[in-house]
Each structure stands twice: as structure tokens, then as C-alpha cells.
């Protein structure tokens, strides 16, 4: 495991692995209930949108991915204009702005994503 994050209500923990897999775990049962395998390199950061319907992950593969926690699918992939390895990720309190830090270029990349806060 390379990183983890607990959802604010304490019901779910998400983990990012060096194998590129993002897993969601039930705190009550202790079981993994979904595994996303879209990343091709180590996951370096995990963040939840404030509404809890989206979990985001950053990776050394140069992508930031948004996963739907209801339908269990990768519905959006963010990349930079040039290849970069992402080392961390964060989302603001409104759920509209995603920030990811590049570890090889020492830059912060921002995406404005109004669609992530839709009900």
C-alpha cells in the first residue's frame, strides 16, 4: 500500500497500491468491496470529493483519475500538457478544483471540474 484516505463519515477507506490498484474498503466489515485497476503505475495519492460520490487518485503513470463510488467506474481521466509523474492530490471544499503535484517537474497542476459536485 502506498497511500490511504478515510471518507469523512468513517464508513469507507480507500487505499492506493504500488501495483496501480485503488481499493475501497468497508470499515464495518473490513472487506474490500471494489478494486479499480486503471492505473498502470503506483498510486501516490487519494482524495474524496465532498459529496462522497467521487474518489480521486494520482499516479506515477501521469494521470489523475476520478472514480464514481456509486457505479464503480473510472469516468474521467486528467493529464497534464506534457508527461509528468504525480506525487499527491487534493480537492477543495467545494469539489470544483483538483490540484496534483508533479514530483519530477516540481509544479502544481489544477483542473476546474464543476461536474464532480453534481447531485
Segments from the language model and where they lie:
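Canonical WD40 repeat/beta-propeller blade segments in eukaryotic WD-repeat proteins
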Residues: 1-6, 41-47, 83-91
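Residue-level detector of Asp-centered blade-edge/turn motifs that repeat once per structural unit
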Residues: 8-9, 50-51, 93-94
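Conserved strand-to-loop turn within each blade of WD40 beta-propeller repeats
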Residues: 15-19, 58-61, 101-104
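WD40-repeat beta-propellers
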Residues: 22-25, 64-68, 107-113
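Short coil turn/linker residues within repeat-based beta-strand modules
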Residues: 29-31, 71-73, 105, 115-117
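Short C-terminal beta-strands that terminate individual repeats in beta-propeller domains
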Residues: 32-38, 74-81, 119
Amino acid at each position: 500500500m502506498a497511500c490511504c484516505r478515510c471518507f469523512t463519515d468513517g464508513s469507507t477507506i480507500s487505499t492506493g497500491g504500488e501495483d496501480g490498484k485503488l481499493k475501497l474498503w468497508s470499515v464495518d466489515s473490513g472487506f474490500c468491496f471494489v478494486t479499480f485497476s486503471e492505473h498502470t503505475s503506483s498510486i501516490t495519492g487519494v482524495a474524496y470529493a465532498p459529496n462522497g460520490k467521487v474518489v480521486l487518485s494520482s499516479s506515477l503513470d501521469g494521470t489523475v483519475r476520478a472514480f464514481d463510488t456509486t457505479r464503480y467506474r473510472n469516468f474521467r481521466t486528467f493529464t497534464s500538457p506534457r508527461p509528468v509523474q504525480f506525487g499527491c492530490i487534493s480537492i477543495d471544499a467545494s469539489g470544483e478544483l483538483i490540484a496534483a503535484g508533479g514530483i519530477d517537474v516540481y509544479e502544481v497542476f489544477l483542473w476546474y471540474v464543476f461536474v464532480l459536485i453534481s447531485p
